[in-house]
Amino acid sequence: PLHFILNNKYSDYQNNYNSFYRFFKYHDLYEICDRMHYCYQKFGSLESALKSTSGHTLVQRIQNLFIDINGIPKPEGNSACKRICMFLRWMIRQDKTVDFGIWESFSPSELIVPLDTHVHQIAKKCGITQRSTPDIKTAMEITDFMKQIFPGDPCLGDFALFGYGINNK
């Protein structure tokens, strides 16, 4: 993938507006790849670009870095930003089992629990949240709760909630 980005192998998609997945067009893929290319050219890595981007959370930093690109949830939107949260978890947590942990500039304590419908339902059943909308605010509320139990790594709570939901259908 890095070779694909650094060598502009994605350039064929620039003017291709055909859909390839749901609401995403090849041009959207071009935009994401081109922004990543910019990050590697200017900062040397996506991690360094994220360090240099403003935002209260790492999710907001990614949103700000890719602000005008289709497929990246907008900061003011109602998305739970699950894919962004998952990506950050994979890159930052260093458990060497599920997560890669190759970014050392950030702490697992900065992560937000990736929120999907199952985790949301279990969190509601357990009284962790009363919010009915599975959005980033709900993900933050669940994360804040998990920080009371796992202050250094609130995403550990994601495994517990997800596992409970899977095993107790």
Explain the meaning of each model-derived region:
Residues 1-169:
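HhH-family (HhH-GPD) DNA N-glycosylase catalytic core used in base-excision repair
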